[in-house]
């Protein structure tokens, strides 16, 4: 079992359609489907955010290799970033709760990020 507590219902774990994952609370763009990859944890995994300010990060208590991440716009809790745990050396793994995400299919990104 991974570091995060598993609550189930991770609808985006095996979801690989082209598009953008936005904050479920405010619609801010967080992750591109291009940065998503299959991982053994039960949560969706991403290697990088869309924008430098897509997420805010703060240290996880007693876990130097883990950071808590939240939406960079509204502060909605998203999950964790695990440093140097991505698919390639030096990459991070963002372990994100499906309930904190909304998926916007390719071609619909602009209207979703503007809250339409």
UniProtKB/Swiss-Prot annotation:
It catalyses: L-methionyl-[protein] + [thioredoxin]-disulfide + H2O = L-methionyl-(R)-S-oxide-[protein] + [thioredoxin]-dithiol; [thioredoxin]-disulfide + L-methionine + H2O = L-methionine (R)-S-oxide + [thioredoxin]-dithiol. The keyword Zinc applies. The keyword ATP-binding does not apply. Its EC number is 1.8.4.12, 1.8.4.14. It is found in: Cytoplasm; Nucleus; Cytoplasm, Cytoskeleton. It holds the Pfam family SelR. One of its GO terms (biological process) is innate immune response. The active site is at residue 95. Zn(2+) binds at residues 23, 26, 71, 74. Keywords: Cytoplasm, Cytoskeleton, Immunity, Innate immunity, Metal-binding, Nucleus, Oxidoreductase, Selenocysteine, Ubl conjugation, Zinc. Belongs to the MsrB Met sulfoxide reductase family. This is Methionine-R-sulfoxide reductase B1.
């Amino acid at each position: 079992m991974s570091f995060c507590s598993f609550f189930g219902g991770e609808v985006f774990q095996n979801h690989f359609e082209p598009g953008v994952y936005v904050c479920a609370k405010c619609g801010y763009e967080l992750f591109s489907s291009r940065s998503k990859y299959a991982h053994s944890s039960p949560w969706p995994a991403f290697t990088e955010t869309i924008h430098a300010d897509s997420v805010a990060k703060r240290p996880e208590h007693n876990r130097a290799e883990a950071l808590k991440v939240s939406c960079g716009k509204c502060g909605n809790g998203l999950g964790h970033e695990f440093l140097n745990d991505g698919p390639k050396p030096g990459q991070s793994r963002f372990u994100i709760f499906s309930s904190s995400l909304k998926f916007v299919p390719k071609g619909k990104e602009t209207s979703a990020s503007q809250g339409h």
